[in-house]
Amino acid sequence: MPRTRECDYCGTDIEPGTGTMFVHKDGATTHFCSSKCENNADLGREARNLEWTDTARGEAGEAEDEA
């Protein structure tokens, strides 16, 4: 039974049969939901600094709760 995975970059759910799984030389795997996420990761951009990622949205919500 296929299962839903989570994008390791932006945090969104990846439907079965979609997305990209990158296997590193050491055997670790990284799942991407789109080429947008894959390219931003390759460029070394931090997901927490991009407004469209769930990671950044989660941190923004925590900052608002503290204020």
Swiss-Prot record:
It comes from Haloarcula marismortui (strain ATCC 43049 / DSM 3752 / JCM 8966 / VKM B-1809) (Halobacterium marismortui). Residues 48-60 have a biased composition (Basic and acidic residues). Belongs to the eukaryotic ribosomal protein eL24 family. Binds to the 23S rRNA. GO terms for biological process: translation. Residues 48-67 are annotated as: Disordered. This is Large ribosomal subunit protein eL24. SMART domains: TRASH.
